[in-house]
Amino acid sequence: ELFHHWFGDLVTTESWSNLTVNESFANYSEYLWNEHKYGKDFADYTLMKAREGYFHDPSNVSKDLLRFNYHSREDMFGGVTYNKGGSILHMLRNYLGDDAFFAGLTDYLKTNEYGTGEAQQLRLALEKVSGKDLNWFFNQWYYGSGNPKLSYTTSFDPVKKELTVSINQGQTEYFQFPLAIDVFENGKPIRKKVWVNAKAINDF
């Protein structure tokens, strides 16, 4: 609730449709505090547990993060607005990097202080600071619904000494996103950062 001094009071959502602009930050602030106080591993664990609030209700998969048609404002509260929203902020932070992410939040707050804000303005602030086009991210995560359902297979060519990792998306609407793959060689992990395109199978 302390985070609402900034995301909710200093800048408040311009409509119930954009409620996640307030509540996802309150949710994600718990991660930031746990990371600061107890370290990244514990914070990652708490984020994983928080995501269960989204996955617990099967109907959440069909709900957009920003919803412009709803019966009651109470419909906007729940696992999508809070838990999924917080996880999406974490993805955005990892994609942009800490410097750009937090500088973008500062710009958003200063630009809209004592007024209202919406996801569109958050995107513009983050784009301004990072220099990256985030339309694809917001269209997919803020204006869309669902989540990737991933599985993977591996194959090894002994002649070429080449490992292929195939990432399979099991849902009907495909996502694009960066992904880190750890490959172990002689007991030591080698991290490969790849880009998963919006299609059923990606080979790396």
Regions from the PLM with identified roles:
Residues E1-G170:
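Hydrophobic alpha-helical and helix-loop surface patches within well-folded domains
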